[in-house]
Regions:
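Subtilisin-like serine protease catalytic core
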Residues: 36-47, 54-66, 75-131, 148-150, ...
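Extracellular S/T/G-rich loop segment that most often corresponds to the catalytic His/Ser-adjacent loop
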Residues: 51, 202-284, 288, 321
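N-terminal domain-start motif of subtilase-like serine proteases
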Residues: 2-48, 71-82, 226-234, 317-320
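Anion (oxyanion) recognition and catalysis
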Residues: 41, 175-179, 246
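Solvent-exposed loop/turn segments at secondary-structure junctions
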Residues: 53-55, 70, 97, 122-126, ...
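Short glycine/serine- and small hydrophobic-enriched flexible loop segments
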Residues: 92-96, 138-139, 215, 276-284, ...
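C-terminal subdomain of the subtilisin-like protease fold in secreted/lumenal serine endopeptidases
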Residues: 149-153, 284-324
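Substrate-binding/access-modulating region of protease and related hydrolase catalytic domains
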Residues: 121-206, 237-240, 256-272, 310-314
Length: 324
């Protein structure tokens, strides 16, 4: 069986503390203040996370509705890698364990009251097989209504070694989820800056693909290097603009697999959940939106636009504009 999915090369622990992006700064960059003043926090919105799993971190406040393990078939929630937990924390960690002396939760996620359904399809090394991902997609479609899933975050990308049939199967699966009312948010991958470097399933015409706004730095971590302008770029082979939206993704501090800890990671894997959290806020305001309507709202709300910042995309996520 071909190893078709992998954590991306630059999803590394970045150790230079002076450049850490705390979640409160992320939320300032994407302009969340008006949304929070409106009382939006993601409550009663369910986000599915397809990744390495999720640890029972205290920041998740018993909001993990269901955990399904397609790798080892374990029943209790766990994350033997940490990537999925980090992603979930960006989307909706409460920040409980990050209070400063003033009581401010520095590391709360974008939508800190969302509920989670977590599908473990990647192993402890961040690798997976296409069959597990497809099983996860089938499970999600069968249980979408039971858990009222509105959003699916996929912060992984298919490797080039995957066969054409596997690629088509995955693209069909995410398109079907979209057709059934799930807003699919994917990472653009970290193979930029060359054109046509967006990973699958991010090349799908339907799904929303997210790149890193702050990828124009070069940092050295403990196990590798982030290349400058690492975010995957389009257009795709079918001349589709990808990624559509940019969000912060470099040196983001979020939940670790330790129940009380936090860790720093970088990559489009971190940018995608920023957008998933923002979409959760928007669904709280507009619960009847279809994925297509939400995607149009994102197109209309981004600022600055791509042409204003020299990027081939729609533009930068702007939450206040999104939730009006």
């Amino acid at each position: 069986m071909i190893l078709a999915l992998s954590l991306e090369v630059s999803d590394l622990h970045i150790l230079i503390e002076k450049r850490i992006t705390f979640m409160d700064r992320v939320k300032r960059v994407i302009h969340c203040d008006r949304a929070y003043k409106m009382g939006l926090n993601g409550k009663n919105i369910t986000v599915a996370v397809m990744d390495t799993g999720i640890a029972p971190h205290l920041d998740f406040d018993q909001r993990i509705l269901h955990f399904e393990d397609f790798c080892q078939k374990k029943l209790a929630a766990y994350d033997d890698n940490g990537h999925g937990t980090h992603v979930a924390g960006i989307i909706g960690g409460s920040g409980l364990m990050s209070k400063d002396k003033r009581g401010v939760r520095l590391l709360s996620g974008v939508a800190p009251m969302v509920r989670f359904v977590v599908l473990k399809v990647l192993d402890r090394k961040g690798n997976g097989v296409t069959s597990h991902v497809l099983e996860g997609m089938d499970w999600l479609l069968q249980n979408r209504e039971k858990y009222q899933v509105k959003i699916l975050n996929i912060s992984v990308g298919m490797m080039a070694s995957a066969g054409k049939n596997e690629q088509e199967q995955l693209l069909h699966a995410v398109d079907e989820a979209w057709n059934q009312g799930i807003m699919v948010v994917t990472a653009a991958g970290n193979n930029g800056p060359k054109e046509n470097s967006v990973t699958i399933p991010g090349i799908s015409r339907k799904v929303l693909t997210v790149g890193s706004w702050d990828d124009n730095v070069t940092e050295t971590g403990n196990s590798g290097r982030l290349t400058k302008n690492y975010s995957g770029f389009g257009p795709t082979e079918c001349c589709i603009v990808k990624p559509e939206v940019l969000a912060p993704g470099t040196n983001v501090k979020s939940c670790s697999k330790d129940a009380k800890g936090y860790v720093v990671k970088s990559g489009t894997s971190m940018a995608a959940p920023v957008v998933s959290g923002a979409v959760a806020l928007a669904y709280q305001k507009h619960p009847d939106y279809t994925p297509a309507e939400m995607k149009l709202k994102l197109y209309e709300s981004v600022y600055p636009r791509g042409e204003q910042i020299g990027r081939k995309c729609w533009g930068m996520l702007h939450v206040n504009n999104l939730v009006v």
